[in-house]
Amino acid sequence: MSVEKAPELRVLSFNCWGLRFVSKYRTERLKAVGEKLAKCDYDIVLLQEVWSIYDFQEIRNLVSCNLVYSRFFHSAAMGAGLAMFSKFPIIESSMNKYPLNGRPQAFWRGDWYVGKGVATASLQHPSGRIISLFNTHLHAPYGKGADTYLCHRLSQAWYISKLLRAAVQRGHIVIAAGDFNIQPLSVPHEIITSYGLVNDAWLSVYPDQVEHPPNRFSMNDKELVEIAGTTCDSRLNTWRENISSKDMDDFVAKRLDYVFHSPSTCEAKNAKVVFLERVPKLDCSYSDHFAIETVLSIKLQPIPVQETRVSYSIIDDTLGITYQYMARERLHMRLRIAHLLISIPLIIGVHVAIAWCDPAWLKVIILFFTVMLTIAAVVNGFCIGLLFGRWEFNGLLEFVAELKEQKLLCKQYLVDHPLPFAKS
């Protein structure tokens, strides 16, 4: 009697660094990505930072023989940069924007303007089961100093974990992938794996791995990729920034790209970092990230969902970070509103003073000064301080309210319904 073989899914996630007018050799690199994907036998491909619809169409045309179904997601002013390719029919899809997603005054970052979020799709697998697919790109920390965007990234991790949890509870085959901009076993990582009811595929395949393997400093560049799973800032990547000699042990190489899966419906059989080669003729890496490839085996008989909740310590840590951030942002909001209130009488006074000014050129200078003062007051005081300040603050209040609810549930479950909790 033959034993039925469990079907497998070969999944790829890749941040393609496709920023228009910024990324070098963007068109050539993304075309090379499409050409390489066309030669591979992936079932599902999730791409991030594909900002141009034309780049998406180029890749789609190249891979359409194998990956018949595709979706490009639109969001905000500049687009989400998220794309999906699949062998299986896409029966439903949507773009879910994060409630907290950077600040408009940091226009050079761009996160607020691109409307980052979670691209979701439901795929019809030949077995008749539904694959719930999630593709995302969380807010980057930016810089080596204090991570002022950590609170937003925690909120984003919480938001996607709620979507994942709902899909797992429906019994779907859940796969979430992308550039999460988080370190393994960090607070955002713990939120996703515990409340989202998913496993980190890399840790599923290599359970002994932690954030920094004990023998990390004895590893060469290749081992750091193959064993530690680093996908960003590796010395093997030609786009890595120049670093000083004190970083020779590859301190800055990080594992930021992930594939998460629902352990109740599928099992991670293999995980590896790919797209390590250089683009032919250009002699450069395909992107400033490497890609992560995972092979998942679909369980013929799904097991009951083991419902975990976020631990007390994780909730407390998250609340502490959020309260600290709220205090800072409340101060900034009040200062900006004060700027607006102070500017109003000042603008009126300058307008009155123009009547007593001679010669005419001085009036022009004062009028120009008044215009600039008005623009600064409206943009900084009204738009950023009042409108966005309240927008962000209300988003933070909602985040805190949901965390407090979870804290109460943790206490109630500990008393009445003991459940396995995530490791704190």
UniProtKB/Swiss-Prot annotation:
The keyword NADP does not apply. It is an enzyme of class 3 (hydrolase). It is found in: Cell membrane; Endoplasmic reticulum membrane. Mg(2+) binds at E49. The active site is at H289. Its main location: membrane. The keyword Membrane applies. It is a multi-pass membrane protein. The record marks N181 as: Important for substrate recognition. Keywords: Cell membrane, Cell wall biogenesis/degradation, Endoplasmic reticulum, Hydrolase, Lipid metabolism, Magnesium, Membrane, Metal-binding, Sphingolipid metabolism, Transmembrane, Transmembrane helix. GO terms for biological process: cell wall organization; ceramide biosynthetic process; sphingoid catabolic process; sphingolipid catabolic process. GO terms for molecular function: inositol phosphosphingolipid phospholipase activity; mannosyl-inositol phosphorylceramide phospholipase activity; metal ion binding; sphingomyelin phosphodiesterase activity. Its cofactor is Mg(2+). Inositol phosphosphingolipids phospholipase essential for the coordination of cell wall formation. Responsible for the hydrolysis of the phosphosphingolipids (IPS), inositol phosphorylceramide (IPC), mannosylinositol phosphorylceramide (MIPC), and mannosyldiinositol phosphorylceramide (M(IP)2C). Belongs to the neutral sphingomyelinase family. This is Inositol phosphosphingolipids phospholipase C. It comes from Schizosaccharomyces pombe (strain 972 / ATCC 24843) (Fission yeast).
